[in-house]
Design a protein with these regions (language model features):
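Alpha-helical transmembrane segments of multi-pass membrane proteins predominantly involved
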Residues: 1-314
């Protein structure tokens, strides 16, 4: 995960302009801070479990398997151990750009080269989510009900704030930055749903992979739609020489093919049936309902409707 940070920071500053250099520096500094927070959390976890492997950490929770707030697990029954897990989650929050760890996203999206930002919005996020799933579902699943609520809260905040702030953006790249925050929230709904479903009733094995499966499907759908949108934005931006949404007026007349590609990508990002993101959202929100997270599913649907406003405005 860290090996992706340094080259992406260099690529973000590749254009050597003021905004590009600022984007690269912000990405590097925020990446370093998140790495330090994660390492401190890992140190605390190692200190209380005596293991650096996910299997060893998971084994320390087996006898007996209780939650932090219920007590009873020697390795996980201390406040310091809980802090370690929270710090680990905070570090991942920076990597996947969730609220309230998203402050770097709009500036980096606006200042970095568009092809680099397209890669960053997909590859970096996918890698971070893949590792998050591996770490928390393999190493901390026996105490998952302790962090599932935090995942749900992060998902709700990211969906609401990401979509609401995106409405007021005039720069299309900043708009996509806030949009990526909202999409991170949708993905976290699947993470929280997978945990809640399995933790709520162990007699429902069919729910075990619903959350992770929905996350992986949505990541693939989001990657395809987002890369397509950035391809169109790059081509249109080179022709009109501007990233302002108001300057996109008349693009359908001057470049009908590019406008059509962008329109299809935006329809997919909204989740218009029968696009892949619609299927992904249906998968995620169904998992949330099955996991008794109905409020989160409703919030996700409302947030999707809000996102349609600023996507259609483009």
């Amino acid at each position: 995960l860290e090996l992706t940070t340094l080259p992406l920071a260099a690529l973000a500053a590749f254009m050597m302009t003021r905004t590009s250099s600022e984007a690269g520096m912000k990405f590097l500094i925020i990446g370093a801070i998140s790495s330090a927070i994660m390492l401190y959390g890992m140190a605390l976890i190692f200190g209380f479990t005596g293991s650096t492997t996910l299997e060893g950490i998971a084994a320390s929770f087996q006898e007996p398997a209780q939650t932090v707030f219920g007590g009873g697990v020697p390795a996980f029954g201390s406040f310091a151990m809980l802090v370690g897990v929270v710090l680990l989650l905070v570090g991942f929050g920076f990597k996947i750009s969730t609220v309230p760890f998203q402050m770097w996203v709009p500036d980096v999206y606006e200042g970095g080269p568009t092809p680099v930002i397209a890669f960053l919005s997909v590859a970096s996020k996918a890698a971070a989510f893949a590792i998050l799933l591996r770490v928390f579902f393999s190493g901390f699943f026996d105490v998952s009900l302790d962090w599932a609520g935090l995942m749900a809260a992060l998902a709700a905040a990211s969906m609401v704030i990401g979509n609401l702030v995106a409405i007021g953006q005039s720069n299309i790249r900043r708009l996509f930055g806030y949009s990526s925050i909202a999409h991170a929230g949708y993905i976290l709904v699947g993470v929280a749903a997978g945990v809640k479903a399995t933790g709520a009733d162990s007699n429902l094995p069919e729910f075990i992979s619903v959350g992770p499966d929905s996350v992986l499907f949505y990541l693939g759908a989001y990657a395809a739609a987002n890369l397509t949108a950035f391809f169109a934005i790059t081509a249109i931006g080179n022709r009109i020489g501007s990233d302002l949404i108001e300057d996109y007026a008349g693009v359908a007349r001057r470049s009908p093919v590019l406008a059509a590609i962008l329109a299809l990508a935006l329809a997919a990002l909204i989740g218009v049936p029968p696009t892949s993101i619609f299927i992904g959202k249906l998968y995620i929100f169904t998992a949330a309902v099955n996991a008794d997270l109905v409020w989160l599913a409703i919030l996700g649907v409302v947030s999707s409707v809000v996102s349609a406003y600023y996507y259609v405005r483009i």
